[in-house]
Amino acid sequence: ASNGGATTSKVTARSLDEIKKSGVLKVAVFSDKAPFGYIDKDGKNAGYDIVFAERLAKDLGVKVKYTSVDPAARVDVLTSNKVDITLANFTVTDERKEKVDFAKPYMKVALGVVSPENAEITDVSQLKGKTLIIAKGTTAESYFEKNEPDVKLQKYDQYADAYNALLDGRGDAFSTDN
């Protein structure tokens, strides 16, 4: 899968001139998905997507205003013009392309599955009848709903909640981009 930055297409997004004139690039990012986007020990946004956003802002001669976003809200914050761009591990899909425009992808990802050492999952077939923890609105959600109907999905709004569910033993495994 490919991840690209995205802007709105069905509503009128701010133009580059409008962004420059305002002095602020509004960017949606994750606050709990290291190493992509997270809040560091000093309470500041950090991660790869943050570095990318800072570079875009520098090139435009503006400052960045970050908005933390849940995976399922990445399209909504764009279509409502709450942000100019989403940099939140945002995989290009046909469904999303109907609502927003994507830039060229800036990284490639694949789905991974993490499980406890004492119940290691090494093949997707081992998930049949098991509970898989995922974040809502993610590639993992759409993949497993479409391709693995025998896997029970336990969905969370926040990545941090999904990670904690695995640590607490509320599911057999957790799937996300690796």
Residue ranges and their predicted role:
Residues 10-89:
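Extracytoplasmic small-molecule ligand-binding "clamshell" domains
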Residues 26-30, 114, 131-133, 174:
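Short, well-ordered beta-strand segments
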Residues 40-41, 53-62, 140-157:
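Ligand-binding cleft/hinge of the Venus flytrap
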Residues 56, 78-79, 127, 165-167:
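Hydrophobic residues within well-ordered alpha-helices
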Residues 65-76, 119, 154-164, 168:
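Short helix-initiation/N-cap motifs at beta->coil->alpha
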Residues 76, 90-98, 145-146, 160, ...:
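A ligand-binding cleft/hinge motif common to bilobed small-molecule-binding domains
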Residues 94-105, 109, 149-150:
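Ligand-binding "clamshell"
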Residues 115-132:
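Flexible hinge/capping segments at coil-to-helix
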